[in-house]
UniProtKB/Swiss-Prot annotation:
Domain of life the protein comes from: Bacteria
Name of this chain's protein: UPF0319 protein VV1_0237
InterPro entries documented for this protein: UPF0319
Signal peptide: 1-19
HAMAP family on file: UPF0319
Family: Belongs to the UPF0319 family.
UniProt KW keywords: Signal
Residue ranges of the TM segments: none
């Protein structure tokens, strides 16, 4: 029994030892990390959360005070769902360009842009989608929304016809133009990281 307790304590210690860290800009709130809701105990000082090494999926919202007609107002974004790969013990930072007015916030809402970087300030490749929900949004079930998105994504992948393309024959420019904005961003970040 004693050996079992020691082994489980070591396993717990070693998993947090190799964990990656993600520091979020002050206004960014983590809602979901890898399918699970985030509790206050999981958010450490400086708005930092631990991530497992490997593939991660996080849903975040941005809440910021902006000006509208000379008055201060709180802007809350739709959830942004990011997917990326974190290396063991990697320190990552997620930021966005702050907005001053409600018009700036609406522009962000229509075309959200965030920056994921490593400790040296190099961009880290990621994909991002905005989980839009119309109507009143007082109490959102972020776990359910992410689970529904993942189920829909898996269903599309299962039903997509398999197409065999010769990678040498595909023109890179054409492929880039066919990508969504988020895919283009992720591709550019990957390309910058892999420059020779």
């Amino acid at each position: 029994m004693k050996k079992m307790m020691i082994l489980s304590a070591l396993a717990l210690f070693s998993s947090s030892l190799f964990a990656a860290n993600l520091t979020l800009q002050k206004e960014i709130t983590p809602q979901i990390v890898n399918g699970e809701g985030v509790t206050l105990q999981e958010v450490h000082n400086g708005n930092r959360i631990e991530l497992k090494p490997g593939h991660n999926q996080i849903a975040v919202t941005i809440g910021q005070i902006v000006f509208e007609d000379g008055k201060r107002r709180k802007f809350d974004s739709q959830p942004l769902l990011l997917e990326f790969v974190a290396k063991p013990e990697q320190a990552l930072t997620l930021k966005y360009g702050k907005f001053r007015t409600i018009d700036d916030a609406k522009k962000f809402e229509n075309n959200p842009t965030v920056h994921l970087t490593d400790a040296q300030g190099n961009p880290v490749a990621f994909t991002m989608v905005q989980l839009y929900k119309g109507g009143l949004q007082g109490f959102r079930d972020y776990e359910r929304e992410v689970a529904d998105y993942n189920a829909q994504k898996a269903q599309k992948a299962d039903s997509a016809p398999l197409v065999n393309h010769d990678p040498k024959a595909m023109d890179l420019k054409t492929a880039f133009k066919e990508m969504t904005r988020q895919e283009q961003q992720a591709f550019m970040q990957w390309a910058m990281q892999n420059l020779k």
